[in-house]
Regions:
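C-terminal domain-boundary segment and adjacent tail
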Residues: 50-51, 150, 204, 214-295
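Sec-dependent N-terminal signal peptides
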Residues: 2-13
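Acidic/histidine-rich helix-loop elements
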Residues: 25-37, 94, 165-170, 176, ...
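N-terminal processing/targeting junctions
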Residues: 12-15, 129
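Catalytic domains of cell-wall/extracellular-matrix polysaccharide-remodeling enzymes
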Residues: 64-68, 88-235, 241
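Active-site beta->alpha N-cap acidic-glycine motif
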Residues: 15-125, 210, 228, 244
């Protein structure tokens, strides 16, 4: 059963709004059930049927820098979606010069594709190991006309996808419904938490950015997820509208590892006490929840 979060902020003006963002496109790895072409087509079909515009963040690994991969990315732009930069090699940001070069190589990969948009998604949401590296990359983004595509609703779709693919390889006829139900509940709870945090931080409804991945799980269940979000009061808008929210004009003032954008701002402003929940700790919690659910 979902955990509903009650807050006294529900009278704030505006609708609860989010945009869908997909990392790691076009993801040409082999998976059970669906080919890379079928997964890409299924994602685009779900978005078209639900009349939702999204953005896919591309890199060159896993087949992205191949004729087939570029065609898959081009299909997103041709369908009216945006194509952003996720670096070429999906490197962890440990050193500025190397990371900057990989960012520029990622830009070269997508430049010229339909839907090309100067939005950048940091791999692993790591914006730099030091203040100097972070500020150096911020300068690079400004010089190249890029905007930081912040995340306010992180999800563990990638972990659920890993578990699903592993189970399908061992048991090809496994029932998918438990994975679908767990996934929808997990994402809806994450969205609820982000909404409450945004209201606390801004005193109004924030236009959120949800992090998803180009993967089998979403190829199978994206339309169900969109319908569940709509049924729970969410309005889905395009990336340009969402990232025009003034919240994204704010800049964090310190190096903050493993925290999404809203959490970082909230902790800096004293809205949230204590240290951020690291991705490693959150990952272990989600793994435990999946095991307890028998998935």
């Amino acid at each position: 059963m979902r955990t509903f979060i009650l807050a006294c902020f529900c009278t704030a003006l505006g609708a609860q709004t989010l945009t869908l963002t997909f990392d790691d496109g076009p993801n040409r790895v082999k998976t059970p059930r669906l080919s890379p072409e079928d997964r890409n087509a299924a994602l685009l079909s779900a978005l078209e049927k639900e009349k939702v515009q999204a953005i896919v963040f591309a890199n060159g690994i896993d087949g992205g820098d191949t004729p087939e991969g570029r065609a898959a990315l081009g299909a997103w732009g041709q369908a009216g979606h945006l194509v952003g930069n996720h670096t070429y090699s999906h490197l962890r940001f440990t050193e500025l010069a190397t990371f900057r070069q990989d960012f520029l190589r990622g830009d070269s990969l997508i430049k010229g594709l339909p839907g090309y948009a100067r939005f950048f998604r940091f791999p692993y949401l790591k914006e730099g190991p030091t203040l100097e590296a972070r500020d150096g990359m911020r300068k690079t983004l400004a010089e190249t006309g890029y905007r930081n595509a912040h995340v306010t609703i992180p999800t563990f779709d990638w972990l659920i996808d890993e578990r699903l693919r592993s189970r399908l390889k061992a048991h090809p006829l496994v029932e998918l419904e438990p994975y679908r139900a767990y996934y929808l509940e997990s994402v809806l709870n994450q969205a609820d938490r982000a909404r409450v945090l945004g209201l606390k931080l801004a005193g109004r409804e924030v236009k959120h950015a949800m992090l998803l991945h180009h993967c089998l799980l979403n190829a199978l269940f994206l339309r169900d997820l969109i319908q569940a979000l709509k049924a729970n009061g969410w309005t889905l808008v395009g990336p340009l509208e969402a990232y025009d929210d003034p919240i994204y004009q704010q800049a964090t003032t310190r190096v903050e590892t493993d925290a999404n954008f809203l959490e970082t701002l909230a902790r800096e402003k004293g809205v949230l006490p204590g240290a951020a929940l690291g991705l490693d700790e959150a990952y272990e919690r989600e793994k435990t929840a999946l095991r307890e659910a028998g998935l």
